[in-house]
């Protein structure tokens, strides 16, 4: 990879909680012939999605956006497609990517994130897994349980929006003492490797 010659690592955005309605896997618009989960009840991708008339458009979608059908991250064939040997993670890391940023990591089950991590580290221990988590990743509660992003079996780090908010608040005139308190709180919560 050309970027590596200059000491630059490319981190890809892994959007694994949903696909586009126009993807070859869902194919709502028919761009890929008659195949795809939306058009073919016998599609190998059909089990990746939740089709039900109770949903707008007839399928579960990310935050109700019909162009973003949600996938079931617990479907074995989907998990294998993303994390298996020769899967998405394996392919792109072996082509030279430095790691992945997991889009909406706080909406992915911990078990799925752990499988993604295993796939990433299988390619190389230096490969990086970053997660989009909007709140304090050490105290996040979701899916009816405390999340385990930074306990050694999930993410290497997170986007750290609380830090961004503290810095932007200071730049926009927020009290320096409160900013310091916020930043020190983040440093106390997060394990050093995740900072």
Language model segments and positions:
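Substrate-binding/active-site clefts of carbohydrate-active enzymes
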Residues: 1-94, 116, 122, 139-140, ...
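Short, solvent-exposed turn/loop segments enriched in Gly/Ser/Thr/Pro and often Arg
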Residues: 14-23, 103-109, 132-137
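Conserved alpha/beta catalytic core and glycan-binding cleft of carbohydrate-active enzymes
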Residues: 21-22, 27-28, 34, 89, ...
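Active-site rim elements
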Residues: 76-78, 101-104
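Residues that cap or delimit alpha-helices
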Residues: 85, 109, 191-192
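Conserved, well-ordered alpha-helix/loop/beta-strand core segments that scaffold catalytic motifs
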Residues: 92, 98-101, 107
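Residues at alpha-helix caps and immediate loop-helix transition turns in enzyme cores, especially N-
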Residues: 112-113
């Amino acid at each position: 990879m050309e970027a590596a010659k200059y000491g630059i690592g490319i981190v890809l955005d892994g959007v694994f909680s949903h696909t586009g309605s126009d993807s070859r896997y869902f194919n709502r618009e028919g761009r890929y012939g008659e195949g795809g989960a939306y058009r073919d009840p016998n599609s190998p991708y059909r089990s990746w999605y939740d089709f039900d008339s109770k949903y707008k458009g007839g399928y579960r979608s990310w935050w109700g956006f019909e162009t973003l059908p949600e996938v079931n991250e617990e479907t074995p064939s989907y998990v294998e497609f993303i994390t298996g040997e020769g899967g998405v993670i394996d392919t792109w890391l072996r082509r030279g990517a430095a790691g992945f940023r997991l889009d909406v990591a706080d909406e992915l089950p911990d078990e799925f994130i752990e499988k993604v991590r295993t796939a990433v580290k299988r390619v190389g221990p230096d490969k990086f897994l970053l997660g989009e988590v909007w709140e304090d990743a050490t105290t996040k509660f979701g899916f009816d349980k405390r999340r385990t992003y930074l306990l050694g079996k999930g993410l290497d780090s997170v986007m750290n929006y609380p830090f961004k908010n503290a810095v932007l608040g200071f730049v926009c005139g927020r009290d320096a003492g409160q900013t310091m308190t916020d930043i020190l709180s983040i440093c106390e919560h997060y394990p050093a490797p995740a900072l």
